[in-house]
Amino acid sequence: MADAAAIDRSAATSPRVCPQVMSPAGGQTSTGNSPARPAVAPGMTRKHLGFLNFGHWIHRPGAEPDARQALDDVVAMAVAAEDAGLDGAWLRVHHFQRMFSSPFPILAAMAARTERISLGTGVIDLRYENPLYMAEAAATTDLISGGRLELGVSRGSPEAALDGQAQFGYTLAEGQTWADVTRERGRRFLSAVRGEGIAAPDLTSGWAHSSQPLRIEPHSPGLADRIWWGSGSTPSAVEAGRDGYNMLSSTLLLQDDGRPFHVQQADQIARYREAFAAAGHAGPGRTAVTRSAFVIQDREDELYFGRERASRDSSGMLEGGAARSGPTYAGSAEEVAEKLAADDAVAAADWVLFANPNQLGVEYNAKIFAGWAEVWRLLGWNA
């Protein structure tokens, strides 16, 4: 994705994708005057709820940029999210920016402080990764966590560095694109975490005890079923389905046919599932969408997010093509529940990840988590 789950936000504003190139467009609107009632009666199928942490240590209110504080905070936020009843704590990954860059040590630290909550990435940029080393790190971390990782991978997003991949030792051969390279790295990573043979054994070494190809160690059973591809378009989602990934979409699509964002994204999910089934993969293939939503409970919330009550779709140009982003949902718990219930893509997805303003600290984010949990209760999605 472009990166579909990867849009920078400031602490006191909700996500809007590339506002310098996006303009208001038709779509879902939020009037802020919906009746105070649950949107859906309890008893619906469970839908998983998580946060997506952007890991900034810039624009932190009342504090100097501090990487250690951001790292300490995200571990504490995972604990707070588990206490609030959330199902997942997910991280963004960026390089050459004041944001999280090395996810596996963070995920391991989160695992050590929690017991139940899933721990994910949205997404790891495969332009910067050796897929076999990443498979070792992923399996090790998954075993430490007790099998709780949900790893999103993809091509990555627009970034600060002009030659970042080259500085990591990765360059394109003639005729290659990063889309091609990252797809191949993703497939090799999947093969490795599935436990397939990778390296030829050296039977003269005294260490190889079989003539069969050697797999990456350690091996974590089940991890391969918890790998997600970040898709910012329908063709990318279809390819993810063919390759056997779960599919992670977000608040941005690198396409726009004029229909509301949530309708286009629901179609993306449907096309992914068709491709997954047609390829003969076991299971239905899971899907996740990212949203921005804030339950306004007091004056502080109103100051930060009150203006988002009127948020709606935006459309414009990004990376030379049409793009469309979804709205922020803000209001009372009942109002946010009603807006989510009317979102076709949210209805279709197995997971919903909400971007959280990590710069506002652990205590404030714990309040945000409690608001989301109340919305889930109203919708009956925590059954």
Predicted regions and their residues:
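Hydrophobic faces of well-ordered beta-strands that scaffold small-molecule active sites
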Residues: 49-53, 89-91, 119-121, 149-153, ...
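Low-acidity, Ser/Thr- and Arg-rich intrinsically disordered low-complexity segments
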Residues: 5, 9-18, 23, 30
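An alpha-helical appendage that flanks or caps ligand/catalytic pockets
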Residues: 39-45, 172-216, 249-250, 257-349
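Active-site mouth loops of central-metabolism enzymes
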Residues: 57-71, 124-131, 223-231, 324-334
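Flexible, glycine-rich active-site loops centered on histidine and acidic residues
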Residues: 45-67, 128-198, 255
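A conserved active-site cap/scaffold subdomain adjacent to cofactor or substrate pockets
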Residues: 235-237, 241-254
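Acidic (Asp/Glu)-rich catalytic clusters
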Residues: 43, 82-83, 107-115, 138, ...
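N-terminal beta1-alpha1-beta2 module of alpha/beta enzyme domains
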Residues: 33-117
